[in-house]
């Protein structure tokens, strides 16, 4: 492999902005901010959404149930089912 073409792969702290939760993982991301954690200084990346705050993972997700095509058809024509147009 060629030297000097690969980005630096290092430990980075990702912080969830909504919850304030921080976790360390490895990444090639470049940041200007740093944070001290466990006695070491790490680059800090602030995330808007992580598994700590996303509604799908927290169980706070509300499911929108859409009625199907058949139900929409039945609801629309249920009103007119009792009335019959005269053929005059």
Curated annotation (Swiss-Prot):
Signal peptide: none annotated. GO terms for molecular function: structural constituent of ribosome. InterPro entries: Ribosomal_bL28/bL31-like_sf (IPR034704), Ribosomal_bL31 (IPR002150), Ribosomal_bL31_B (IPR027493), Ribosomal_bL31_sf (IPR042105). Keywords: Ribonucleoprotein, Ribosomal protein. The keyword Nucleotide-binding does not apply. GO terms for biological process: translation. GO terms for cellular component: ribonucleoprotein complex; ribosome. Coiled coil: none annotated. It holds the Pfam family Ribosomal_L31. SUPFAM superfamilies: L28p-like. Part of the 50S ribosomal subunit. Belongs to the bacterial ribosomal protein bL31 family. Type B subfamily. This is Large ribosomal subunit protein bL31B. It comes from Bordetella parapertussis (strain 12822 / ATCC BAA-587 / NCTC 13253).
């Amino acid at each position: 492999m060629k030297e000097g073409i690969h980005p630096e792969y290092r430990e980075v702290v990702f912080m969830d902005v909504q919850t304030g939760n921080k976790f360390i993982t490895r990444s090639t991301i470049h940041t200007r901010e740093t944070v001290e954690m466990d006695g070491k200084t790490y680059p800090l990346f602030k995330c808007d959404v992580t598994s700590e705050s996303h509604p799908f993972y927290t169980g706070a997700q509300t499911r929108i149930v859409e009625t199907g095509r058949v139900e929409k058809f039945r609801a629309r024509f249920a009103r007119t089912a009792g009335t019959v147009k005269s053929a005059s």
